[in-house]
């Protein structure tokens, strides 16, 4: 008789309670991952095709393929105006802000859509703060088992150690062997070599790819420096006859993938002032730099004794465009943002081996985004997902 009865909470309240518990604890990573694909160009095109006016404007832009690779002659200026008018009609559609992702499926299709919607940019009207790629947060930690390096001599250089770590990792080893075979001197076919290089730097874990390419060497260790310089198989990957840098850039701009990677590099490795203030974080600049490897604009270390990088091209014969050509050269060889990003990554790699981790597997998470809203949420044991809601629900009865 002394007991009081209270009605059970409605089912909707219970569901809301469970969701409120689950989202803060475990949804941080999944939401960040899902949001990366909210407005991909492939999805935006599907939305556009559902609207007759949008579909017609997009199809008209699709017929303007000639404007995607070269400026139009004067007699075709009317066609160019029509293309730009169609692009203007799409400014209120989701296509105008769509982006692609570096490791997405059907990346080539996505980039084709992007450049169809932005024909003016493909003609050289480059906006340095706009990249076709959405800048996402890297959430996977670096995991390496240094104990497996005991088979190497203690004084082995770090480039050899990173190469061994790749060899001991099935996926990295498979991808590295694929481009090694395609880029070998006997079988060298440059287009196949470049394709396999792109595959390696797109599919291998960043920890392995960056470790191989950006391994630090002692100044006097020429063997280590040569191993680092040969990482991308330059004898096959780089042009046999050194082209003019502006011609190389024009060739790159004619290809949607190369154009996109160059645009990404310009966006994230661009010094904004004479003091060398960089537009974005070092991790983004490095990712954009690695994205160029395997394209016509593949850069590399110029020697085995330093860490200066450059394009494999020359400015001889540039005529009135000499200054523009030299500026393009300096965007790699004397770029303060790129220089410091490479130096910082090499310092990080050196620190990994400076501690006594020989008997353990270490995991390092580098913060890739300064926006607190995009930072990774702490992962709690899965047990908490089942226990906490039950405890809280029990108090309601």
Swiss-Prot record:
SUPFAM superfamilies, per database record: GDNF receptor-like
Protein name, entry field: GDNF family receptor alpha-3
Keyword Disulfide bond in annotation: yes
Lipid group attachment sites (GPI-anchor amidated asparagine): 371
Primary gene name: Gfra3
Species for this entry: Mus musculus (Mouse)
General function of this protein: Receptor for artemin (ARTN), a growth factor that supports the survival of sensory and sympathetic peripheral neurons. ARTN-binding leads to autophosphorylation and activation of the RET receptor.
Propeptide residue span(s): 372-397
Protein family per UniProt: Belongs to the GDNFR family.
């Amino acid at each position: 008789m002394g007991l009081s009865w209270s009605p059970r909470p409605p089912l909707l309240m219970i569901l809301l309670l469970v969701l409120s518990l689950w989202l803060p604890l475990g949804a941080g990573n999944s939401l960040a991952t899902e949001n990366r694909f909210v407005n991909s160009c492939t999805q935006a095109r599907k939305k556009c095709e559902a609207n007759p006016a949008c579909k017609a404007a997009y199809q008209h832009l699709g017929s303007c393929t000639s404007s995607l690779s070269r400026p139009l002659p004067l007699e075709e200026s009317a066609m160019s105006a029509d293309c730009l008018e169609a692009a203007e009609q799409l400014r209120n559609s989701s296509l105008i802000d769509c982006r692609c992702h570096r490791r997405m499926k059907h990346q080539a299709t996505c980039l084709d859509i992007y450049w169809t919607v932005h024909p003016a940019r493909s003609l050289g009207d480059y906006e340095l703060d706009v990249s076709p790629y959405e800048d996402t947060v890297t959430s996977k930690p670096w995991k390496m088992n240094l104990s497996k390096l005991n088979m190497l001599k203690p004084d082995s250089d770090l480039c050899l150690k990173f190469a061994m770590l790749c060899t001991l990792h099935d996926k990295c080893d498979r991808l590295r062997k694929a481009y090694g075979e395609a880029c070998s001197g006997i079988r060298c076919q440059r287009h196949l070599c470049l394709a396999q290089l792109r595959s390696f730097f797109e599919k291998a874990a960043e920890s392995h790819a960056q470790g191989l390419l950006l391994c630090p060497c002692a100044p006097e260790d020429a063997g280590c420096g040569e191993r680092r310089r040969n990482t991308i198989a330059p004898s096959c990957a780089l042009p046999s006859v050194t082209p003019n840098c502006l011609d190389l850039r024009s060739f790159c701009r004619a290809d949607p993938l190369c154009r996109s990677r160059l645009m990404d590099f310009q966006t994230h490795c661009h010094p904004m002032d004479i003091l060398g203030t960089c537009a974005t974080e070092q991790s983004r600049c490095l990712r954009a730099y690695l994205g160029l490897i395997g394209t016509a604009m593949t850069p590399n270390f110029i020697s085995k004794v330093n860490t200066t990088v450059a394009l494999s091209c020359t400015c001889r014969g540039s005529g009135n465009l000499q200054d523009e050509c030299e500026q393009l050269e300096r965007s790699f060889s004397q770029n303060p943002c790129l220089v410091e990003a490479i130096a910082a990554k090499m310092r990080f790699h050196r620190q990994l081996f400076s501690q006594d981790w020989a008997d353990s597997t270490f995991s390092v998470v580098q913060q890739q985004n300064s926006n607190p809203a995009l930072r990774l949420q702490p992962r709690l044991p899965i047990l908490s997902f089942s226990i906490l809601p039950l405890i809280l629900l029990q108090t309601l009865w």
